[in-house]
Amino acid sequence: YAQHLVQQQVSSGDAVYVHLPRSLSLYLVLLAAWKAQKVYVPLDPTLPLDRLRYMIQIVGSGTIVTTDEYEHMIDVSLPRLLLRQLEEPCSERPFTYEPSLRVPAYILFTSGSTGKPKGVQISHRALAAAIKSWKIMLPYTQQSRLLQLASPGFDVSLFELCLPLSLGFAMATAPKDILLTDLEAAFRALRITMADLPAALAALVHPEHLPPMEWLMSGGDMVDERVVREWGTPPQKLINAYGPTEGTIGNTLG
C-alpha cells in the first residue's frame, strides 16, 4: 500500500484522502499513508458531499483513496487510487522508511457547530506524546480488547486504533449498524474489556451484562448519573475524558 502511495509523485506531507467506511482496509491505508510520510485525511462516506468538497478545498493537493463503489461520489480533480490498485503487486523496489516526528500525522475537521468546520493539523510528535500519556494513565494488559466504534472523522477513532497498536493488545470492531442494534451483545461477542463511548451510548451498557471490563471511558457530553453510579463503583472504573480536536486526543482524563 505504502509503495503505491509513494509512486504518486507527491511530496512528503501531502494529503492522502481516505474515502472509505470503517473497515480493515481503512486502517491499512491509514498506516500506509504514515509509512509513506503522507498526511491522513479521512473522508467519511456518510457525510454530505458538500462537506467533503469543502474539506478537500481547505486541505488542498493530495491523492484520494477510495473504492469502485465510492469513486464517483466526489467530483474533484485530484489523483485517485482505488483500493484494489493498492492491493496489486508493486514493481518498484521497496523504499526506505525514515520516520519523522516533524511530519504532520493527520488533519481532522471540527464539527462546525459555531460556524464553518475548521481543519486541524496534528503532528506525529503530538500524537506520540498523547500515546505516551495514555500508556501511563490507562490500565491495560496484553489480553485487553478495545472497541473501535467512532467514525473515522472523529479523533476518538485514532485513539481506538493507536492505543492497541502502540501498546500491544487487540482492537475489535464490527459494522456500526450491528454494534448499535445490541451494544451489550456486541461487547460479549467481541469480548470487549475497554471502550470509549459517547454519553448517550454509555447509558445503554450495564457492567453486570458485560464481560469483565477494565474501564469505560466517556466524554463530549454530560454523563448520566446512573452511569456514574454503576461504573464509578469498584471494581468498575469510569473515566471521564475531554479534549478539543486542536489538542490532539483526550487532553484530560479523570
Question: PLM features: residue spans?
Answer:
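Conserved S/T- and glycine-rich ATP-binding loop of Class I adenylate-forming
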Residues: 16, 33, 64, 104, ...
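Gly/Ser/Thr-rich phosphate-binding loop
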Residues: 166-171, 193-196, 202-254
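Conserved coil-to-alpha-helix start sites within the AMP-binding
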Residues: 20-31, 46-50, 149-167, 181, ...
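Conserved acidic residues
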Residues: 53, 62, 144, 193, ...
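Carrier-protein-dependent adenylate-forming modules in NRPS/ANL systems
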Residues: 1-128, 138-139, 168
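Short acidic active-site motifs
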Residues: 50-51, 179-183, 226-227
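Conserved AMP-binding/adenylation subdomain of ANL enzymes
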Residues: 118-147, 154-193, 252-254
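Alpha-helix capping/helix-boundary segments
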Residues: 47, 69-71, 178, 200-202, ...
